[in-house]
């Protein structure tokens, strides 16, 4: 393990570990709200879409199968390689990206991130995530940030233990390590308008 790796890069090792066992990290069932938002806001196939934290591509596949122009990104090279191998017809749509330290030359009509924000623990990293989305979203664009939590309880992971692999018992080899509540005010502070009717 590289001592210079950031805590949120621990998923690289987790993906490698489960893939070496011939299993996937998550189920292949897509997150319904991703396509629900596309339909609700009349996002057209020719629009530019960005997925942050695509993992093994479960949501990417659903979007790409519908003919949308999607760039699917993840910080994990292992996850991107897995997605390209399992969806060779869409391989060119997947790329490695650390949205906290890299930039893209494009802007997007729809940016979505499912189960990403809870992995960014310090406030400065969450702020960097919001800034990346704000900087890459077209002026009339739509952003979907879908995270874990019950809306009341906030649990903060110990980032010093991010690289400690833990034995987990779960049906799809998919367990996420922390759960957070995102106050709407933090989205408003970063220049986002919110739609509280989604749910």
Give the ranges of each region predicted by the language model.
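Class I (Rossmann-like) S-adenosyl-L-methionine-dependent methyltransferase catalytic domain
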Residues: 1-45, 49-103, 142-199
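A conserved beta-strand element that flanks and buttresses the S-adenosyl-L-methionine
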Residues: 112
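Short catalytic micro-motifs in class I SAM-dependent methyltransferases
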Residues: 115-119
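Conserved catalytic-core motifs of eukaryotic protein kinase domains, centered on the activation segment
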Residues: 122-124
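A short glycine-rich, Lys/Arg-flanked "PGG" loop and its adjoining helix->strand segment in the class I
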Residues: 127-139
């Amino acid at each position: 393990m590289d001592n210079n790796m950031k805590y949120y890069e621990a998923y690289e090792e987790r993906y490698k570990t489960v893939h070496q066992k011939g299993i996937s990290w998550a189920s292949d069932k897509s997150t319904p709200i991703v396509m629900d938002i596309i339909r609700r806001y009349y996002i057209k196939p020719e629009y530019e879409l960005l997925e942050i934290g695509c993992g093994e591509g479960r949501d990417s596949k659903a979007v790409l199968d519908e003919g949308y122009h999607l760039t699917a990104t993840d910080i994990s090279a292992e996850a991107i390689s897995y997605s390209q191998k399992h969806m060779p017809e869409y391989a060119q749509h997947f790329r490695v990206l650390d949205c906290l330290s890299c930039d893209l030359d494009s802007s997007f009509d729809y940016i979505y991130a499912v189960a990403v924000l809870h992995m960014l623990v310090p406030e400065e990293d969450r702020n960097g995530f919001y800034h990346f989305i704000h900087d890459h979203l077209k002026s009339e664009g739509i952003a979907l940030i879908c995270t874990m939590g019950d809306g009341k309880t906030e649990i903060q992971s110990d980032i010093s233990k991010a690289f400690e692999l833990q034995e987990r018992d779960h049906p799809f080899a998919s367990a996420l390590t922390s759960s957070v509540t995102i106050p709407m005010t933090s989205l408003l502070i970063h220049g986002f308008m919110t739609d509280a009717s989604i749910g």
